[in-house]
A protein has these predicted regions:
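ABC ATPase NBD coupling module
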Residues: 69, 81-102, 125, 137-141, ...
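The feature captures the beta-strand-to-loop junction immediately N-terminal to the Walker
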Residues: 50-52
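ABC ATPase C-loop
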Residues: 159-160
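Helix-to-loop junction immediately C-terminal to a conserved catalytic motif
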Residues: 65
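Conserved ABC ATPase signature
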Residues: 142-146, 150
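Catalytic Walker B motif of ABC-type/P-loop ATPase nucleotide-binding domains
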Residues: 167-171
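Conserved ABC transporter NBD signature motif
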Residues: 73-81, 93, 121-123, 127-130, ...
Length: 256
């Protein structure tokens, strides 16, 4: 490959989306939950997806990862169409997923979790322990004895050791104390700064704004809002009405 071609490809990777969704219709069996949804995320960006409970946010992630039914549309990672791929194939292609229920195994230690799905790359167990120092002291602890915050850190760490190019996180701050939430948000920002594209479902709008380069809102499976964090702040009342969730003040130390 010539130097010019290699350079051109690097430039394209910077400017082209890392992940794209085109006119997705998806749901469970014959039931359609997501309708005509499209968006794109570039490398090193975070997209926050907001909306009230039951509007299809989790179903969206389940469809992207192959756990729910895709009726039509396209799921593209880099230059590859992953729409027909299996859940395993999508993970191998670089799609990481932290589900809402965390899926931590009670009978495995922290260290054993970080061997699951491990692939060569920047993110290994040592890098995860550096990102989450609290886990380093719990290497031999079973999943059953971890706190909710520790389980969430471990779920993120387990996804990271697969060295995905795109990470999906479904409400990672749910049910956690403000102190733990602040630490998680700082960790997610570091992940984004390392060049990963992150898709974040978040019920708390202040958290969504604190992390996002871009925000979208969905209602009844359809896109009802799209804008950056500054626009979302400026249109606070309008977006609150759309998503049915109150927008609280964003802490200054968590904003860009």
């Amino acid at each position: 490959m010539s130097t010019w071609v290699a350079l051109r490809r690097r430039v394209l990777r910077v400017h082209l989306p890392m992940f794209e969704l085109h006119k997705l219709y998806a749901g469970w069996g014959k039931t359609v939950v997501i309708e005509d949804l499209s968006f794109a995320v570039k490398q090193g960006q975070c997209l926050s997806i907001i909306g009230r409970n039951g509007v299809g946010k989790t179903t969206l992630f389940e469809a992207i990862t192959g756990r729910a039914t895709t009726h039509s549309g396209r799921v593209i990672l880099g230059e590859r169409d992953l729409t027909p791929a299996t859940t395993f194939e999508k993970a191998r292609a670089g799609l990481g997923y932290v589900p809402q229920n965390r899926e931590v195994f009670k009978s495995l230690t922290v260290a054993e979790h970080l061997q699951i799905g491990r692939r060569p790359g920047f993110w290994d167990a040592a890098a995860v322990y550096q990102l989450f120092p609290g886990l380093a002291a719990r290497k031999q602890s079973l999943g059953a004895v971890l706190s909710g915050g520790e389980q969430q850190m471990l779920a993120i760490g387990r996804a990271l050791v697969g060295n995905p190019r795109v990470m999906l996180m479904d409400e990672p701050t749910e049910g956690l104390s403000p102190l733990i939430v602040e630490g998680l948000l700082q960790a997610i920002r570091k992940i984004v700064n390392e060049g990963m594209a992150v898709l974040l479902v978040e019920q708390q709008l202040d958290v969504a704004i604190a992390l996002a380069d871009h925000c979208i809102a969905i209602d009844r499976g359809r896109l009802v809002y799209s804008g950056d964090a500054q626009d979302l702040r400026a249109r606070q009342s309008e977006v609150e009405a759309l998503v049915g969730v109150a927008l609280t003040d964003v802490r200054a130390d968590l904003t860009h």
